[in-house]
């Protein structure tokens, strides 16, 4: 079996082969969905008592009172102080860059006044309270804390509540340190669907939030789907994706490692290279074969590349851009000369990395833009997480007496046409001369 699929856009069956490669349907495991539904209903009904029970069952953490599940801020700062200097400096540098970028996204209230004195506008307000889910256990995701928490605080969210499971009572110090740096307000040692339920419905200990963001396992994803509508959610993310457009002049090892950077996430991750240079594709394939055995996650890489990876020969870079728009990838690298020229042709991508030195990994951690990106072709209609996800817009309408004379007649005419007499009368009552 080949290490990675090879496709040629000139082949008659190319479109079918590409569609099969891209096909991904999130597994709607009925047992997981039903388990999540049961946990949510129980947390909604029994509150803290259910939280304590599920935390003991799933995380083997037994406490007598739900208030003991809250992690004191002093512990976060102790975790921050205990980090190796280089790690702390890296976290703080990344946080500063993420904050600087997202401050440019902050929306502002605006108004304008018409000639008759009528004022119209839009008022921007932040959400009152947001919940942030951070996976726990052996894996540490401090970057997720930064990418989710900092935009919320830049948006002006007064209260940001983090939940993170602590299996066997073991807390992840780098996650707590990131919470201290990012401006999280409260943190609780809870996880799974029960944590989502606590954030959505509230308990005596955990306050209900307006929106839940952050990644999680299948149970967390199922729970987020079910509470959507009661609260807002960010998205239900699919497997990680990278698409690279290359002119054949970037070192092959660089491109191979860029493909690895997403393929190593899990077996369903997707890594694709588009290039008009057949010899370069062969170089990249050779680099993959040479570098892969030395990778710690080689087993995952092999499955991911064999099942969902591809090296695709295209006619030219214009065609590569057209294919990229059809794929609408989460991450798109344009590793070419004059990358701005090709970026102008891209309409659908979560994040675009321009030039040979802009590796996707830099965006994951510290470039500044958010790493929470649309997957599974949803970049056709959705955007990266940002400050705007934590702000709301309210329309402002202040009609002057003079304005009411004009607008009232228009509104009444339209309302009567729709058979809504009270609407019409409401407008007509304000007319000086009906």
UniProtKB/Swiss-Prot annotation:
GO terms for cellular component: cytosol. It catalyses: L-histidinol + 2 NAD(+) + H2O = L-histidine + 2 NADH + 3 H(+). One of its GO terms (biological process) is L-histidine biosynthetic process. Substrate binds at residues 240, 262, 265, 331, 364, 418, 423. Binds 1 zinc ion per subunit. HAMAP family: HisD. Pathway: Amino-acid biosynthesis; L-histidine biosynthesis; L-histidine from 5-phospho-alpha-D-ribose 1-diphosphate: step 9/9. This is Histidinol dehydrogenase. The gene is hisD. The keyword Oxidoreductase applies.
């Amino acid at each position: 079996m080949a290490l990675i699929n090879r496709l040629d856009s000139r082949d008659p069956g190319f479109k079918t082969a590409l569609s099969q490669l891209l096909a991904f349907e999130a597994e709607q495991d009925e047992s997981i969905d039903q388990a999540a539904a049961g946990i949510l209903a129980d947390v909604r009904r029994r509150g803290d008592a259910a939280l304590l029970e599920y935390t003991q069952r799933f995380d083997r953490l037994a406490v007598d009172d739900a208030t003991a599940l809250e992690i004191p801020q002093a512990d976060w700062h102790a975790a921050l102080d205990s980090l190796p200097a280089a790690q702390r400096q890296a976290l703080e540098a990344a946080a500063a860059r993420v904050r600087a970028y997202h401050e440019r996204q902050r929306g502002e209230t605006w108004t304008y006044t018409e000639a008759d004195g009528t004022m119209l506008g839009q008022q921007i307000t932040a959400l009152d309270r947001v919940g942030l889910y951070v996976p726990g256990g052996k894996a540490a995701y401090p970057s997720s804390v930064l990418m989710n928490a900092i935009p919320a605080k830049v948006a002006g969210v007064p209260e940001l509540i983090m939940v993170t499971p602590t299996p066997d009572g073991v807390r992840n110090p780098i996650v707590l340190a990131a919470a201290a740096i990012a401006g999280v307000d409260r943190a609780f040692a809870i996880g799974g669907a029960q944590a989502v339920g606590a954030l959505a419905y509230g308990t005596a200990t955990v306050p209900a939030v307006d929106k839940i963001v952050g990644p999680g396992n299948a149970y967390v994803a199922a729970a987020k789907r079910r509470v959507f509508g009661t609260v807002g959610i960010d998205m239900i993310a699919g497997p990680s994706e990278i698409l690279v457009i290359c002119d054949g002049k970037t070192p092959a090892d660089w491109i191979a490692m860029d493909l690895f950077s997403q393929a190593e996430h899990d077996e369903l991750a997707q890594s694709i290279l588009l290039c008009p240079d057949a010899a370069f594709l062969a170089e990249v394939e050779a680099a993959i074969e040479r570098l892969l055995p030395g990778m710690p996650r080689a087993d995952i890489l092999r499955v991911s590349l064999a099942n969902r990876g591809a090296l695709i020969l295209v006619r030219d870079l214009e065609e590569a851009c057209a294919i990229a728009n059809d794929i609408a990838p989460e991450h798109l690298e344009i590793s070419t000369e004059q990358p701005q020229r090709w970026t102008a042709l891209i309409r659908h991508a979560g994040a675009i990395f321009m030039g040979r030195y802009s590796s996707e990994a830099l965006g994951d951690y510290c470039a500044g833009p958010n790493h929470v990106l649309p997957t599974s072709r949803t970049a056709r209609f959705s955007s990266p997480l940002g400050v705007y996800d934590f702000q709301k817009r309210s329309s402002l309408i202040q009609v002057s007496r003079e304005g009411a004379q004009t607008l009232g007649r228009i509104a009444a005419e339209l309302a009567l046409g729709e058979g809504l007499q009270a609407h019409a009368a409401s407008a007509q009552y304000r007319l000086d001369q009906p």
